[in-house]
Amino acid sequence: MIDLNTLVQETGAESGLTFNIDGILLESVNLEYDGNVAAMIGMILKMCLEMSEDVNNGDLKQVMIKNKEGIVVANKDEYDNCVALLSKDISKMGLLLRKMDTVFNN
């Protein structure tokens, strides 16, 4: 199992959460409204998974959301367990992507 506190600390992310593909929160670190965030990211992952299957691009592994105020990187494993890291520092994007790839062995 992933140590979410360590993952947040090692990446410098402001917050993180673990949840299942149905958006049910398992754990969160430094995140207000964590249940709502888990539900929304879970829905995004599920929709992207279905789109990936529809266009025959293989299994979905990762979704990145970048906006003016920050970044969200969410990964899903083969058992539909999910981890998301959130940062307001866009310059950490490469570190977040690389660390999540390492954790999930993508």
Regions found by a protein language model. Give the residues of each.
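Non-catalytic interaction/Regulatory regions outside core domains
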Residues: 1-15, 19-21, 25-106
